[in-house]
Amino acid sequence: NWSWCSGSGEGCDYHSECCGERCCIESMCIGDGVACWP
């Protein structure tokens, strides 16, 4: 569950985490910016 973001975290809302080029939406960033889980 993700959407695009910038490296600064811009574009992620309060319950999202910037993970590389994507926002992890209600999930966590794993693999040093590789993927969102779950």
From Swiss-Prot:
Top-rank taxon, per record: Eukaryota
Disulfide bonds: 5-19, 12-24, 18-29, 23-36
GO molecular function: sodium channel regulator activity; toxin activity
Transmembrane regions: none
Subcellular location: Secreted
Expression (tissue specificity): Expressed by the venom duct.
A GO-annotated cellular component: extracellular region
Entry keyword set: Disulfide bond, Ion channel impairing toxin, Neurotoxin, Secreted, Toxin, Voltage-gated sodium channel impairing toxin
Primary location group: secreted
Family per record: Belongs to the conotoxin I1 superfamily.
Free-text note on domains in this protein's UniProt record: The cysteine framework is XI (C-C-CC-CC-C-C).
Function: Iota-conotoxins bind to voltage-gated sodium channels (Nav) and act as agonists by shifting the voltage-dependence of activation to more hyperpolarized levels. Produces general excitatory symptoms.
Name of this chain's protein: Iota-conotoxin-like L11.5
Lineage: Eukaryota, Metazoa, Spiralia, Lophotrochozoa, Mollusca
